[in-house]
């Protein structure tokens, strides 16, 4: 059954709940070999690197115990508002020249203000037109319209931290 599941995944088909539950009891070594077979099919021996820039630092209202950006803890991180377009462009160009395939602006906070989001859209539009690198984003919670705006200016992937 494990081989059948591997083939389904490689063929781009979903597995059923029953098949997923089957994987719980598979020998760990066999499971690792199956996962490696899937990885080799989709990725070969390459990896996809996304470099990030801390586009806005500190003063986050969230209370993530591990995070130095939270206002709930005294840390020594630099606190600053959204970086200027030229600073972000310089870092994106540097990464592209180093062979990095993806670049993401990461901002602290649950949300960006409307003004900050508009500025981010301008920055991504600028990068998309001038820097040969795939664009990603990690900007907190967004609505559908904001996701569509990011997509329209060339953002291909969205990173999200899911904490339990």
What do these predicted regions represent?
Residues 72-164:
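Core AdoMet radical
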Residues 1-61:
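Flexible, acidic/Gly-rich N-terminal and inter-domain linker regions that tether
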Residues 44-87:
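Canonical Radical SAM [4Fe-4S] cluster-binding loop centered on the CxxxCxxC motif
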Residues 12, 35, 64, 105, ...:
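Conserved, mostly hydrophobic/aromatic
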Residues 33-37, 60-70, 155-157:
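Short, charged low-complexity intrinsically disordered segments located at boundaries
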